[in-house]
Amino acid sequence: MTVEKTMDKIVALAKNRGFIFPGSEIYGGLANSWDYGPLGVEFKNNVKKAWWKKFVQESPYNVGIDAAILMNREVWVASGHVGGFSDPLMDCKECKARCRADKLIEDYMQDKDENFESADGWSNEQLKDFIDKNNIACPKCGEHNFTDVRKFNLMFKTFQGVTEDAQSEIFLRPETAQGIFVNFKNAIRTTRRKMPFGMAQIGKSFRNEITPGNFTFRTREFEQMELEFFCKPGTDLEWFEYWRDYSWNFLLSLGLAKDNLRIREHAKEELAFYSKATVDIEYLFPFGWGELWGIADRTDYDLKQHMNHSGKDLTYLDPETNEKYLPYCIEPSLGADRVALAFLVDAYDEEELDGGDSRTVLRLHPALAPFKAAILPLTKKLKDKSLEVYSMLSKYFNVDYDEAGTIGKRYRREDEIGTPYCITIDYDTLEDNTVTIRDRDSMDQIRINIDELVKYISEKVEF
């Protein structure tokens, strides 16, 4: 049976099962603010752990860093964010709604089912002309009466210290990358790494988006998983292709359906002025294709900017050739919230069972599941033995314990939150030290000795 996956179903499951709640809900919420609940925080942490494992732990090239969110204002001047990090905005003269011009065009073309990829890189005049020519209406009131397009800086501004003046002005970082670039020399010096090498970081970023939406896909506060991979100029396109393929295979290895993924190459007019090549790995959400991962060849732009603005020498001296150069940088940048949402959508399933029964199941890769197993005593009289098994397994995995309701209803609850294995403690357990372990996806059951549980589950959840 083909299941219709809608955002309404995903949002309802996320809220009802403790994955994601609306932020500040008891005060009426805050637009596009979301809190990860008890299951959501485990799930998202598992996504981050999987990325760190493959991009840092198992990589002979890469090291980690955790840079500060608040940085010297000059960092953002050097990077170009103070002067150029902006969205093209228009105001509706009828209802005063503020709209992103490029998104108006992209949504209009998507509704027409036209083969249109992006309005990135268009000038203000091109955007306005297209909107006027096609009589694109305001999504809020339906009228076509817009102001001219103008740029709006996306950075959140605040002040450090007791005075609010230009000298104390700082920003919440709009990306994690700059914290890596300014620590390039520190990492080279302390790790004694040679080219090529990379620096990875997971952290929060903030952008004052005008049109956030689609649940956790586009929010003003979000988490990034970024790698800045430095290499010798001339080898950059080779490494660009390497990290593009590595990133693609990472998603497939965690179970995302290949049919729901695509690689979109940026056209020349879309490229950032510093970029030599950029591709996006996109996922087919219920609301359409959306970017998960951007892989860009940033050349030596960032290191050169920071070297020029700071006056510090950021060149690399090759110890084997004595050649001195500014490394080029390949950046695979992944949104943690976006890819977590993609895993949720992809895993969601509804299954018709024999006897007219049905179930909702999250077919998450076991490495990503919030709980790796659930301990289910057949009756409450078996609680002591069940808690003994729980205590043993919880030293190795995050496991659930549930003794409320029929065993069938407990199976359904665990299916819906993605628990790959349910372990039932029954009266035979007291006699022969064995338990029944049920597979989430196939619903097959086998009998296994308690002493073998850790090994069995470890092999199944390995990634």
UniProtKB/Swiss-Prot annotation:
- Residues bound to substrate are 100, 175, 222-226, 331-335
InterPro entries for this protein: aa-tRNA-synt_IIb, aa-tRNA-synth_II, aa-tRNA-synth_II/BPL/LPL, Anticodon-bd, Anticodon-bd_dom_sf, Gly-tRNA_synthase/POLG2, Gly_tRNA_ligase_bac, GlyRS-like_core
GO terms for biological process, alphabetical: glycyl-tRNA aminoacylation
Q: Which domain of life is it from?
A: Bacteria
Is Cytoplasm among the key words of this record? yes
The Enzyme Commission number assigned here is: 6.1.1.14
List the catalysed reactions.
tRNA(Gly) + glycine + ATP = glycyl-tRNA(Gly) + AMP + diphosphate
Q: Which CDD domains match?
A: GlyRS-like_core, GlyRS_anticodon
Coiled coil stretches, renumbered: none
One Pfam family this sequence matches: HGTP_anticodon
Residues bound to ATP: 207-209, 217-222, 291-292, 335-338
The yes or no answer to whether the keyword Nucleotide-binding is present is yes
Keywords attached to this Swiss-Prot or TrEMBL record, sorted alphabetically, are: Aminoacyl-tRNA synthetase, ATP-binding, Cytoplasm, Ligase, Nucleotide-binding, Protein biosynthesis
Subcellular compartments: Cytoplasm
One GO cellular component term, please give it: cytoplasm
Q: Which GO terms describe its molecular function?
A: ATP binding; catalytic activity, acting on a protein; glycine-tRNA ligase activity; protein dimerization activity; transferase activity
Where primarily located? cytoplasm
Biological function = Catalyzes the attachment of glycine to tRNA(Gly).
On assembly, the entry states: Homodimer.
Family of this protein: Belongs to the class-II aminoacyl-tRNA synthetase family.
Name the record gives this protein: Glycine--tRNA ligase
Name of the encoding gene: glyQS
